[in-house]
């Protein structure tokens, strides 16, 4: 019927628009129009399930994920993904946290090493001074 064809055409149009939204990075988009054709209904359901899986395994906003990855590539680990729910989002935040911890540990270790090195240098200077004093005393006798 004409009404069924119009309903199907509307669903196809919305499906194409939804794919465009997903291509722009938004994985929360879903097809809501209801076609009449059973094959189009199945296609709509399959596409929506695919989007559900992508959102669960990756996250909601591909652009935000890409931005964080670019920051990480530039060795900037200060930012996190807000409202991380997808596996990639959660893992990205966890990796960022672990890298920050490792960098802090390395910094603490380097500071401790610098402090101990200063103490050692001072001890060597004292030992050298004492050795020179003893050598001078021995020369006097």
Ranges and model annotations:
Residues 1-141:
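HAMP domain helices
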């Amino acid at each position: 019927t004409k009404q069924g064809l119009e309903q199907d055409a509307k669903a196809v149009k919305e499906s194409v628009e939804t794919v465009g939204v997903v291509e722009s990075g938004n994985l929360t988009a879903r097809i809501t129009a209801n076609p009449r054709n059973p094959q189009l209904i199945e296609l709509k359901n399959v596409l929506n399930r695919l989007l559900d899986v992508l959102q669960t395994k990756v996250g909601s906003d591909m652009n935000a994920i890409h931005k964080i990855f670019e920051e990480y590539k530039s060795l900037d680990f200060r930012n996190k993904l807000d409202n991380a729910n997808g596996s990639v989002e959660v893992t990205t935040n966890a990796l960022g946290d672990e890298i920050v911890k490792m960098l802090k540990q390395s910094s603490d270790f380097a500071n401790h090493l610098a402090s101990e090195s200063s103490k050692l240098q001072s001890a060597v200077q004292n030992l050298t001074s004492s050795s020179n004093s003893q050598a001078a005393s021995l020369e006097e006798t």
